[in-house]
Amino acid sequence: MSVVVLGVGGGIAAYKACLLARLLSEVGHEVHVVPTRAALEFVGRPTWEALSGHPVHTEVFDDVPDVEHIRLAERADAIVVAPATADLLARLAGGHADDLLTTTVLATSAPVLLAPAMHTGMWQNAATVDNVATLRRHGLVVKAPATGRLTGRDSGPGRLPDPDEIAEFVDLLITVPECAAAMAQQDLAGKRVVISLGGTREAVSYTHLRAHETSLH
């Protein structure tokens, strides 16, 4: 069983993180939800605790004796932040550690996936573009948002990807983090990608096989 820390930013897409938490739990992950203060304005603490089966904290000082941010950082096999708001991207890019989520991300050695969601103008703003580049340079995986209907009548890039897509990406992040990072930086919309893990055998003659213990395509 893998331990997944699900960070939730304070955006309207926070409701999608409820389904993501359930999907991750259903496939066998131990999920710990860490919402920001703003996220609790969209989805309350009891909902997160019911979906994850674990207590939910937002501040470093909520559970001082257990040093929660270090405990989560060390136990996590992966951290996924969905939605990652423009504010969260800026704080993480700057190395801020002013709540439980940012301190956990800063302290972990586990792979981190950020799934941004915001208005198109905010996503394309030069400051956000620079922050995303900084985060990727620091080794965090930033998955580009989907394109479609946004809050209100606007449409464009900035939608949080479907929860099932993020859940599949989390599994990839845990098993093959390098591949996940490469895929996240490419526009794969409308393309089919096949990932094959495990041994392969290739016939080179009627009597000989070329065998590989592991393969990745």
Give residue ranges: language-model regions.
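Short glycine/serine/threonine-rich phosphate/pyrophosphate-binding segments
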Residues: V8, I12-L19, D87-T102, E202-Y206
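Short glycine-rich anion-binding loops that position phosphate/pyrophosphate groups of nucleotides
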Residues: G11-I12, A39, F61-D62, A84-L89, ...
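Short internal beta-strands
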Residues: E30-A38, L114-P116
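Glycine-rich oxoanion-binding loops at beta->alpha junctions
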Residues: P46, A50-R91
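Active-site and donor-binding regions of nucleotide-sugar-utilizing enzymes
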Residues: E68-R71, A76, T85-A127
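Short, glycine-/small-residue-rich phosphate/pyrophosphate-handling segment
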Residues: P111-A146, P157-F169
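Glycine-rich phosphate/pyrophosphate-binding loop and the adjoining helix
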Residues: A146-V194
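Conserved small/polar residues in nucleotide/adenosyl-binding loops
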Residues: T207-T214
